[in-house]
A protein has these predicted regions:
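N-terminal intrinsically disordered, cationic/polar leader segments
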Residues: 1-26, 33-94
């Protein structure tokens, strides 16, 4: 199960979906792709300053002074992981 915590100034994710064995888990791959894209987009397409920590099974993104453009990117990321969870039920929002 991937645990996702969202606050006004951060996103924290930890764990694995457990949908398939390591290296073949399409749920973990999809969540990772969306999250990497969020980090890259916030860094390159907005003026939002972020701090991102990533390790195996753990990601934390923090920011201050979120812009409207940054909020749209975070909302888009959230829509994506919500859709994944509706299909595979492997994400717990905490």
């Amino acid at each position: 199960m991937i645990k996702v915590g969202i606050t006004e100034n951060s996103i924290r994710m930890e764990g694995h979906a457990g949908y398939h064995r390591d290296g073949q888990d399409i749920v973990c791959s999809a969540v990772s792709a969306l999250t990497c894209n969020l980090i890259n987009s916030l860094e390159n397409l907005t003026n939002v300053k972020i701090r991102a920590e990533t390790e195996e099974g753990y990601t934390k993104i923090q920011w201050e002074n979120m812009t409207a453009a940054g909020r749209i990117l975070v909302d888009s990321w959230f829509l994506g992981i919500t859709a994944i969870n509706q299909e595979y039920n492997c994400i717990e929002f905490v």
